UniProtKB/Swiss-Prot annotation:
Full protein name: Large ribosomal subunit protein uL11
Database matches in InterPro entries: Ribosomal_uL11 (IPR000911), Ribosomal_uL11_bac-typ (IPR006519), Ribosomal_uL11_C (IPR020783), Ribosomal_uL11_C_sf (IPR036769), Ribosomal_uL11_CS (IPR020785), Ribosomal_uL11_N (IPR020784), Ribosomal_uL11_N_sf (IPR036796)
Domain of life: Bacteria
Posttranslational mods: One or more lysine residues are methylated.
Taxonomic path: Bacteria, Pseudomonadati, Pseudomonadota, Betaproteobacteria, Burkholderiales
A single Gene Ontology CC term: cytosolic large ribosomal subunit
Length: 143
């Protein structure tokens, strides 16, 4: 018989930098989960990724105090800002443009994000990424 699920916890944690301090400690502690066990497992799975890149994670907590977790792809906005080499998007996105990315960069981001996007193919995923970039005040060349 399957274990009884008592809840899901959604967090964004920098790759390789999970530690018991907030937000990880309080979120897991409320459900009675082993915080250090999660931190070690998360850091082990994300050590191949760029350190500090925020990684969304969904933790499934079970009634017997065990857990499983699923890593998602980094947020599109973080990848877009990194590609455009900017710190933050525009405060007036459709008026003030703060950077540019090429279609090739948008395709790379779309390939990275593909498992988490609902797009049917790569072209649709590129258009999704281009829309996110435009809403941040970043021009996408060739789309």
């Amino acid at each position: 018989m399957a274990k009884k699920i008592i809840g899901f916890i959604k967090l964004q944690i920098p790759a390789g930098k999970a530690n018991p301090s907030p937000p990880v400690g309080p979120a897991l502690g409320q459900r009675g989960l082993n915080i250090m066990e999660f931190c070690k497992a998360f850091n082990a799975q994300t050590q191949a990724l760029e350190p500090g890149l925020p990684i969304p994670v969904v933790i499934t907590a079970f009634a017997d105090k065990s857990f499983t977790f699923v890593l998602k792809t980094p947020p599109a906005t973080v990848l877009i800002k990194k590609a455009a080499k900017i710190d933050k998007g525009s405060s007036k996105p459709h008026t003030d443009k703060v950077g540019k990315i090429t279609r090739a960069q948008a395709e790379d981001i779309a390939k990275t994000k593909m498992p988490d996007l609902t797009a049917a193919d790569l072209d649709a995923a590129v258009r999704t990424i281009a829309g996110s970039a435009r809403s941040m005040g970043i021009t996408v060349e060739g789309v």
